[in-house]
Regions:
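C-terminal ends of transmembrane helices
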Residues: 24-38, 86-100, 152-163
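Hydrophobic core segments of alpha-helical transmembrane domains in multi-pass membrane transport
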Residues: 8, 15, 46, 51-52, ...
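Generic transmembrane alpha-helix signature in multi-pass membrane proteins
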Residues: 23-31, 90-96, 106-108, 115-128
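Helix-coil boundary and interhelical linker segments in multi-pass alpha-helical membrane proteins
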Residues: 1-6, 59-73, 122-135, 189-192
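C-terminal transmembrane helix-loop-helix hairpin of multi-pass membrane proteins
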Residues: 131-192
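Cytoplasmic-side transmembrane-helix entry/capping segments in multi-pass membrane proteins
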Residues: 37-48, 72-78, 100-111, 165-173
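Structural signature of hydrophobic alpha-helical transmembrane segments
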Residues: 5-19, 69-84, 135-148
């Protein structure tokens, strides 16, 4: 049965959100989500890297790895592609927006090892999507990641102004907030 683009988009953004349902990309989700602006920048960078990696990894898998019978090299090849794309994003951000480059700090190079980027590239191949379906899947998954990141950052900014018991301040309240956000996203599970 052919997967519709609408189902891919809704499923990737809301139902199977890469962070809140599949638990991929937790490190940047917790690390960069203290401010909405930083979260938006990280979301944009991840979206750009995922979109480019979708095209490049699909082409490499389809036209090089499978014909040569070296599918076992998939993970290594995908990591190299993602690393090269992240370096490109880092160079562009450093020139275009030095403030965002500074705000993202160590998390920008960590996109290379962000399991969400690699995991989505591998899932795209496992689901046997066409190039266009894979691109839609990767971009919508990245948008879902960015949406969760920005919502979570907004919640964390509001929590800073509230009085929480000492035991819950910092990471504990962030994890509780993330779990409530994940439960809220579970409400979308009947959509697709």
């Amino acid at each position: 049965m052919e997967t519709t683009y609408f189902a891919i988009i809704i499923g990737s953004i809301f139902v199977n959100n890469v962070v809140l349902a599949q638990f991929l990309g937790i490190c940047p989700f917790l690390g960069v989500s203290s401010k909405v602006e930083t979260s938006m920048g990280m979301g944009a960078a991840v979206t750009f890297v995922m979109a480019l990696s979708a095209v490049v990894t699909w082409l490499l898998q389809t036209y090089i790895l499978v014909p040569l019978g070296i599918e076992y090299m998939q993970t290594i090849v995908f990591i190299l592609v993602i690393a090269a794309l992240v370096q490109m994003v880092e160079i562009v951000l450093k020139k275009v927006s030095p403030s965002l480059y500074q705000a993202l700090g160590i998390f920008l190079p960590l996109i290379t090892t962000n399991c969400a980027v690699l995991g989505v590239a591998i899932l795209m191949i496992q689901k046997e999507f066409t190039l266009l379906q894979g691109l839609v899947y990767n971009v919508s998954t990245a948008l879902g990641f960015a949406l969760a990141l920005v919502i979570f950052a907004g919640l964390r900014e509001r929590i800073e102004f509230e009085e929480a018991p000492k035991a819950f301040q910092g990471v504990p309240i962030a994890l509780i907030t993330a779990s409530i956000l994940a439960m809220a996203f579970m409400g979308f599970s009947g959509l697709v």
